[in-house]
Amino acid sequence: MGHRKLSSPRRGSAGLRPRKRADEILPTPKNWPLVNLKEPKLLGFIGYKAGMTHVYMIDDKPTSPNYGKEVYTPVTIVESPPILGLALRAYHIDSKGELSVLVDYWANFEEGSLKYLKRKITSLKVDSSKMKEKLDLIQKNLNNITYMRLLVSTQPWLVPSLGKKRPEIVEIQIGGGSIQDQLNYGLSLLGKQIPVRDVFREGQLTDIIGVTKGKGFQGVIKRYSVVEFPRWHKHRKGSRKIGARGPSISTPSYVPQPGQLGFHRRTEYNKRIIKIGDNVNEINPAGGIVNYGLVKNTYLVIEGSVLGSRKRPLFLRYPIRPSWSPESAPKITYVNLASQQG
């Protein structure tokens, strides 16, 4: 059966290894895009997947065969309440030539929304007496600083559908402008509510990083799409398994084997934001979204499907390799608000 190696050399993609459970429910980007912005801006945001519906919109992509026509488009609703700026983190290249943290400058946790947040995260301990020294250290090393990033916190208590109060704390890079501009911009966000409109605009592309739906421990038929053997009397060794795996100690890594399926960290590139809205009556279906409820905060409408289950946090990042650059949002002519409960 020598032809088998040519017609079907392997199963599965090596680019998706290891096929294991994600380390955290909200992954953070491993790389950030180099953006050409005149003014500094955050390069990411966090949202919660609510569900899907469909819209009719005017296709505005010039290279599309349906350009200028009304098209049916499935969309995903992502609820995105404001995030809180917690700390400004400066990165530099250390003596080993590696990227490392120079200093963290934290906001005052005795004021405003951060006072409530401090009760939610009891492990968060900040010595405010040393903050002036840390800010002076940043000012002295501006020429050596490579990146400025902002530590932010989500506010899940603003989303009743989640049923959770413990926030996620993530790090978002500041892009655009000079390092001094990024420092001033980051300081202006500390302790403040940051809406999604300050980061993204309608019509632009975004990369979405998250964790896929978990399927548990699965066999090779479902995990690698191995062809099932015919069920007849001479196939006595089973049908839903591979024909020959060999000794376990010398089994090649590309041979399909059962194991974890789903709950993997994945990145979906160039998803388009076709709408950012505050009027929830324009997006909530009758009776609410199944297994989620009603959207009650600022929301994003993403073209197409998005990875993950309902209520799962998603990290939205500026596109690292955009396929095209939309100038504006497409015109939406109809949004389906019919009940999803039959």
From Swiss-Prot:
Pfam families listed in its UniProt record: Ribosomal_L3 (PF00297)
UniProt keywords, alphabetically: Ribonucleoprotein, Ribosomal protein, RNA-binding, rRNA-binding
GO terms for cellular component: cytosolic large ribosomal subunit
Protein's UniProt keywords contain Ribonucleoprotein: yes
GO BP terms, alphabetized: translation
Region named Disordered: 1-22
GO molecular function: rRNA binding; structural constituent of ribosome
Family to which this protein belongs: Belongs to the universal ribosomal protein uL3 family.
Assembly and binders: Part of the 50S ribosomal subunit. Forms a cluster with proteins L14 and L24e.
Known role: One of the primary rRNA binding proteins, it binds directly near the 3'-end of the 23S rRNA, where it nucleates assembly of the 50S subunit.
The name this protein goes by in its record: Large ribosomal subunit protein uL3
